[in-house]
Amino acid sequence: MQRSVTAEESYRRGRDHLDRGEMQPALDHFRAAHQVDRANPRYRSFYGLGLALVERRFDRALELCRSAAKEEFFNPELYHNLARVHLAFGFKAEAIRYLRRGLMIDPGNGAMQEELRGLGLRRRPVLSFLPRRHPVNRLLGRFIRPWGVVEEEPAPEPQSA
């Protein structure tokens, strides 16, 4: 006799596969969890993440992840998923925005901190009224950087000519 798998078991198996980088099996388990319990924001968010990473369905993935984060706005993990969906489709600025939102809820979240660091954050110019490349900003930046006084900001997106 085969027992039915609960939504939570499917979700946990999906997380295990996701952590190992096995995206298709992760999506299958997240889909199963979502089908059993469509009201659960966590299952909905991870199902959306799986759709983005495996099937490249940005609109549906974004819809699922946003609705989950809206419902459970205090869960930083759901903002992390939103950021990962945006990153999968090249929307770096939006990803940074959602990572920061998640870190406002849980400042000690190592996964989100690491993801944010990996996106190549730059320091703000010392004198914001001067361009970043101005010699005075560059000189002051070299002296101030060792003390970590200047705040960080996202690296600008490359502009096409």
Where do the model's predicted regions map?
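Short amphipathic alpha-helical surface patches that serve as generic macromolecular interface elements
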Residues: L62, Y79-H80, A95-L99, N109, ...
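Non-transmembrane alpha-helical oligomerization segments
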Residues: Y47, L82, L140-F143
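Intrinsically disordered, low-complexity, charge-biased linker/tail regions
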Residues: M1-R12, D16-D19, K70, F74, ...
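Alpha-helical adaptor scaffolds
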Residues: R12-D19, R31-E77, R84
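Structural signature of tandem alpha-helical TPR/SEL1-like repeats
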Residues: D19-H29, V54-S67, F89-R101, P125-P131
